[in-house]
Amino acid sequence: MTASPDPAQRIDALRQRIEDANYRYHVLDEPQIADVEYDRLLRELEALEAAHPELATADSPTQRVGYLAASRFAEVRHVLPMLSLGNAFSDEEVAEFVRRISERLERKQPVFCAEPKLDGLAISLRYEQGEFVQGATRGDGATGEDVSANLRTVKAIPLRLRGTGWPEVLEVRGEVYMPRAAFEAYNAQMRLQGGKVLANPRNGAAGSLRQLDARITAQRPLSFFAYGVGEVADGALPPTHSTMLAQLREWGFPVSQLVEVVQGSEGLLTYYRRIGEARDGLPFDIDGVVYKLDDLAGQREMGFVSRAPRWALAHKFPAQEQSTTVEAIEIQIGRTGAATPVARLKPVHVAGVVVTNATLHNADQIARLDVRVGDTVIVRRAGDVIPEVAGVVAEQRPAGTHAWQMPTQCPVCGSEIVREEGQAVWRCSGELTCPAQRKEAFRHFVSRRAMDVDGLGEKFIEVLVDSGVVQGVADLYLLNVDQLLQLRLISTADSPHAFLREAREHLAAGAYAQVEQTMVGIGVDLAGVQPAPQTWQADLLRAGLPAFDWNRKKIATKWAENLIEAIETSRDTTLERFLFALGIEHVGESTAKALSAWFGELDVIRHLPWPLFKRVPDIGGEVARSLGHFFDQAGNQQAIDDLLQRGVRIGDAHPPSPKLRGALSFAVLLEDLDIPKVTPVRAQQLAAATASFDALIASEADPLLQAGVPAPVIASLQQWLARPENAALATAAQRAMDALLAQLPQADAVQAGPLDGQTVVITGTLAALTRDAAKQRLESLGAKVAGSVSKKTAFLVAGEEAGSKLDKAQSLGVEIWDEARLLAFLSEHGQAV
């Protein structure tokens, strides 16, 4: 009689067989067993694990389905940002990309890794000791959403790495996508069942990963291709991008078979054309190709610019186009007042999406294209994403059309629409008196990358603004649960009488009579003979209501309580988030971050004259003037005061950066004021001759001539300073500069950090802080934090489960610090956790 196999051995054998089948199917494209056999093996494994729950593990193939997310996705901070790529649409742009790399690295024919650019959803997969522990979306590049449970359902993603030699921590970056055939089959099945079909494979992939129930995601035919790595700790990777991809394939990750190594711009363009010709026959959607410098050391030398690497480029295919009819041209007002013309179109399918609106960019673009209502136009999804009107089919223009003109008044508030000299953009002059601008300002203020008020959707923002409940963003911090519930009750009522019927359920007799009196006061005929004013809802809210008793009749209140909690949570923020949330024109996240790093305190920034902003890296004259204009407005200063008075707290204030001492001087200020004829050389001469604007204003020409300043420059300077507003700006800027410099230590008094010149390595898991936080604190004390141990390492910080780095440090005689010693050292030097 044959003995029954040991359950643990059988489970191990089944797991290995199933994962091997997954690897052969998704990575090697060499299916070895039939689907029915695969299903039989999986069912057997499920039965064995159910009978022996002590043998179940997180990396078992049976654990791909069954995880339920919380009511929302948790945020994940990417250790290494998931950067976007620069785009190219022409051969010339590709040639320029190659030229820059050639010159920087002094290589005549750089070698690149070229690969298709999948039209899916970018994700990051984190593995620790070979096991999948977390998956996140790209999000804004710095912060994504934890979609681990959903990613477990994607069979192409390994739950445990194959082979050996992988780093202790490995983040793999790639694209989740929906194959075309699977997309069509899924939609066909949905039509048979009367279910909802997917618009296109890209939307299908993105929507599937954002399901809160992983069982729904598991029903979607998703796949995955790896294209790079993020954080790597305690381990090494091959020296080139192409060999790194080959290594990822050996560890179990699918990598596109279309990846190639090519040389120079000619090799890149040949690859681009070949993939473009094959595009329609590929089993998945792509919207271009990606070029990456193959040499990883070269990538590090090239570095990054803004939010994109200098060593990579996305070469987009020509946008897909269709023709349709312009039914109307309307104006949309943005948060800075920009009036953007939008074409309302007869619905048309473009690249798998129904397009009903397309941007016309600005009035100059409309005039150049001569777009008119009634025209047949070519609609393009530029970069396969943003619909735009690319041209007019003039021969199909109907008779009687008229050239379009920018309206003179804002369609929302009636304020004048004006165009600043030299600008392409027209703007509503109503500023925050314009409801459209207020709504956009609110949307921006509460967005995730700004104040991050979760749960405040666009429609409810419209209700808040239209009702007059909030006039400025600071009014958010005056809201309470009762107001929110009343607001929803009123905004969802289709008539005053419908509202009164509902209100009666939540009010005592006296309070209800008070509401009826208020209704009469705003012009509502309680008998119902006369029609109610169209603005009755807003008028009623402005008139005020008594407190409702929500316990008289049960009503859903959790949403309002959650929203108030989110508003309360947002009170504690950082300076860069606060600055970004203010919605200052031209001030994005990177600019806000730079302002925070250089100036340190809101009170400093909000009172600086604009020329001083120009010394911050990446801030030019246009951005500096925009900052100055914003803070010059009394209404904006009042809005900031209101936010602070209502409890918004900026928790990361710090002194101005010592770098300002080397960046600011009287000569620099002369240069940055944009005075005609005052070049950097002339600014140095002027600064050598005199020390202040007060002295310059009082000075005669002779001392300046004797200092070598040409007479035309002196005349231009004197003419500029003769205007009172210029003299006031110059003297205010110098006073502000002197005040800033007075806060900084003298150059010879700046003390070296306790770890200056020392190289430190961190390994293992720390309990009190993340490794990234430890790195930041050590770097602030002067250390260079490296990824590998060598004889030059000053000391190694070893947390729990320290790996090979600890062994190497001990063999080299490197000093070992435990977490307690690290925390004590940080505390001693003002970096307490």
Curated annotation (Swiss-Prot):
Q: Which residues form the BRCT domain?
A: 750-833
One of this protein's GO BP terms? Answer: DNA repair
The active site annotation covers K117 (n6-amp-lysine intermediate)
Q: Which GO terms describe its molecular function?
A: DNA ligase (NAD+) activity; metal ion binding
Q: Name one Pfam family in it.
A: Nlig-Ia
UniProt keywords (A-Z) are:
DNA damage, DNA repair, DNA replication, Ligase, Magnesium, Manganese, Metal-binding, NAD, Zinc
Keyword presence, Nuclease? no
Q: List the catalysed reactions.
A: NAD(+) + (deoxyribonucleotide)n-3'-hydroxyl + 5'-phospho-(deoxyribonucleotide)m = (deoxyribonucleotide)n+m + AMP + beta-nicotinamide D-nucleotide
Cofactor dependence is on:
Mg(2+); Mn(2+)
Q: Which GO terms describe its cellular component?
A: cytosol
| EC annotation from Swiss-Prot or TrEMBL | 6.5.1.2
Q: What InterPro entries would the database entry show? A: BRCT_dom, BRCT_dom_sf, DisA/LigA_HHH, DNA_ligase, DNA_ligase_AS, DNAligase_adenylation, DNAligase_N, NA-bd_OB-fold
Positions with a binding annotation for NAD(+): D35, V36, E37, Y38, D39, S84, L85, E115, R138, E175, K292, K316
Q: What class of enzyme is it?
A: ligase
Enumerate the residues binding Zn(2+).
C410, C413, C428, C434
Please describe what this protein does.
DNA ligase that catalyzes the formation of phosphodiester linkages between 5'-phosphoryl and 3'-hydroxyl groups in double-stranded DNA using NAD as a coenzyme and as the energy source for the reaction. It is essential for DNA replication and repair of damaged DNA.
Q: Which HAMAP family match?
A: DNA_ligase_A (MF_01588)
Q: Which family does it belong to?
A: Belongs to the NAD-dependent DNA ligase family. LigA subfamily.
Q: What is this protein called?
A: DNA ligase
